[in-house]
Amino acid sequence: MPVADTSQLISGVAERYASSLFELALEAGSVEAVGADLDRVQALIDGSEDLKRLVVSPVFSADDQFKAISALVEKFGFSGLVGNFLKVVARNRRLFALPGSIKAFRLIAARHRGEITADVTSAHALTAAQETELKATLKGVTGKDVAVNVTVDPSILGGLIVKVGSRQIDTSLRTKLSTLKLALKEVG
């Protein structure tokens, strides 16, 4: 299966799981609580190479994945919807779709709240004040509340890359240097 087909499959699985979880959370009136728990799950994945390996590696059996996720649910107190969701995903051998499901849940919840999502890449972590100012600026441009997903990528050297929907604003130092380099090649 080509790589593009694989990522579409993962995306489709992730979106179906996220959509189902969102509907259940909406019925229970716990969308915000579920979102907060999913953020905690993502932080755990990001902070642990072992957990990351468990999530992405097909080497682990369904039983091993289920036992590990059950222990995680117990240890960190994920109860109710998120605890059951994690166990179902593990039991069905779909842990590979967990990060995508978390991202899809965030997007569905934001859309439900009337927000749009901006993916921001920065060379350094943004302070709370910078993030607040960025949200206000983007709200002024789009006319909607904006949820910001910040990714730190030191390779952009400085500035920001902001993606909102199909629009991208690239003020990164890396892009400016590349543009300058091309301009100098044309002159020389």
Curated annotation (Swiss-Prot):
PROSITE patterns: ATPASE_DELTA. Keywords: ATP synthesis, Cell inner membrane, Cell membrane, CF(1), Hydrogen ion transport, Ion transport, Membrane, Transport. The keyword S-adenosyl-L-methionine does not apply. InterPro entries: ATP_synth_OSCP/delta_N_sf, ATPase_OSCP/d_CS, ATPase_OSCP/dsu. Pfam families: OSCP. It comes from the Bacteria. Its main location: membrane. It is found in: Cell inner membrane. It is a peripheral membrane protein. PANTHER family: ATP SYNTHASE DELTA CHAIN. F(1)F(0) ATP synthase produces ATP from ADP in the presence of a proton or sodium gradient. F-type ATPases consist of two structural domains, F(1) containing the extramembraneous catalytic core and F(0) containing the membrane proton channel, linked together by a central stalk and a peripheral stalk. During catalysis, ATP synthesis in the catalytic domain of F(1) is coupled via a rotary mechanism of the central stalk subunits to proton translocation. This protein is part of the stalk that links CF(0) to CF(1). It either transmits conformational changes from CF(0) to CF(1) or is implicated in proton conduction. F-type ATPases have 2 components, F(1) - the catalytic core - and F(0) - the membrane proton channel. F(1) has five subunits: alpha(3), beta(3), gamma(1), delta(1), epsilon(1). F(0) has three main subunits: a(1), b(2) and c(10-14). The alpha and beta chains form an alternating ring which encloses part of the gamma chain. F(1) is attached to F(0) by a central stalk formed by the gamma and epsilon chains, while a peripheral stalk is formed by the delta and b chains. Belongs to the ATPase delta chain family. This is ATP synthase subunit delta. It comes from Sinorhizobium fredii (strain NBRC 101917 / NGR234). The gene is atpH.
